[in-house]
Amino acid sequence: MPTRAILFAVAVLMVTSTATARAQKTELKWGPAPPSLPSGARMAVISGNPAAPGPFTIRLRLPSGFTVPPHFHPVDEHQTLISGRIGHGMGDRVDVRAVKWLRPGQSITLPANSHHYVKTRGRTLVEVSAVGPFTVTYANAKDDPRKR
């Protein structure tokens, strides 16, 4: 009887690992980032919907030298750097000397309504999680790409 139980457990583990492997092979669907971000950014939705109520996770591909001018969100924003370099600064104007750079695997949480800006070095892939609806409000209206 113990042999049958062991064989059953092994079979269950094999089926589970096959299903997991299939789920991880799903290709992300990349498209342009929302118009609230400067041009050049690409976005893929991992889960949820940033425009709807509830949790969501997205990935952003950002070109080298990309800058998101000072802005804020009504909710906490959680970022995990996957590749490249991403830097964050706080305040209503960009100060490159004040930027704190993340390395791949590092994370940052930007509190709701905190004014911050983002810069990249090299092609950058970052995962962003928050609760929607997620909005971007620029500290300086002239920086808003939707108004150009």
Residue ranges and their predicted role:
Residues 1-8:
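Bacterial N-terminal signal peptides that target proteins for export
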Residues 68-70, 88-89, 110, 115-121:
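Short beta-strand His + acidic residue motifs that chelate non-heme Fe in jelly-roll/DSBH
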Residues 8-17:
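Bacterial N-terminal signal peptides
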Residues 63-66, 73-93:
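Glycine- and acidic-residue-biased ligand/ion/polar-headgroup-sensing regions
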Residues 43-47, 58-66, 70, 95:
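N-terminal post-signal-peptidase region of extra-cytosolic proteins
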